[in-house]
């Protein structure tokens, strides 16, 4: 974005330089529901000439083991004329087994997604790829570019407190249980404050459907409060990204990374 090298961006943005370019109309942008982007690529509404995909390794069978995100990689590789795979040696090989790759059938032949619980696994731990499309495999050793989260301020803590009071009211009304609470979490400092509040709550065996795994969710898993979380990627501070790399084999039992069409499906 800073080099003025991006013509079009979709379906999401959070980078200040990119936001500035979009607002100045020097970069085209479409704000698309995150579960729709893969479908639009799948249905040939968006062409993909070259897909650049990050992986932790490529198996002997030619399958791709994704790294800390799945996103729309399945659809991008299926649609692309050419594929470049970046094997990032900074990412832990122990991430293998954390992914659950299930490809949504094309319209008009869609079927119900066979997931009823956050911990359900319905696919494979790898992405199948046409080897004829691969034009390059590049080795790198680069950390994810993630900024640390700001400490929870007074407003964030009040919002988190109000939310936890609401949950307590739902338990008192008989609509919710302290055991097995299934939640959906957003992105940012306020959701992280809610996670911190849940650490000191009466809730146990928490399960989550979310878009990204953040620091607060890792703390809940460490505490034993959260048993499983379903997402499409990590959005961790540098400290927690390092922690994930060091302990990926443990977190693999509690985290499932899925294609974005699945993780963000309404």
Regions inferred by a protein language model and the residue ranges of each:
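Conserved alpha/beta enzyme-core scaffold
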Residues: 1-266
